[in-house]
Amino acid sequence: MGVNFMNKLNDLLEKLASPLKDYSSCLLRIGLGVSFFLHGYGKVPIQQGFIDWLASKGLPFAELTAFLVAWGEMLAGIGILIGGLVGLRTPVVGNIITRLSGGAVMVIMIGALLLAHSNWGIFFGERGSILFASEQLFLLLLGTYFAIKGNDH
């Protein structure tokens, strides 16, 4: 039963999944693009409290940084989404948009982890922070995925 059952199960799963394989990266693209856009959209208009918080972390040019973070998140999210669509008509341009947007996500998330969430370790920290820190890591890893892979399926 063991090996034969596993082979049959694998064949069944392969049969079910194979029509959807070409769309699997679209699910990641939609999740990251929408999530990142919404993170930025929630910061606009830029609130003085956000600027003050950035300044309290020792960042010079806190007002400019707040603007760049908010708009960077929105534009990177849009770029992740439209990079795939543009890539259907002009593959090189779509690939560049996707990779640059993924790189922007990486830079923003590294900054967020180091600045905003530096006390939220994976195995220690405030109650509930482990889950939130993992969300930040997932966003960073998805950005890295698109920066490396681009639109290559």
Question: What do these predicted regions represent?
Answer:
Residues 44-64:
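Membrane-interface interhelical connector segments
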Residues 2-45, 64-71, 75-153:
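Extended, low-polarity transmembrane helix blocks
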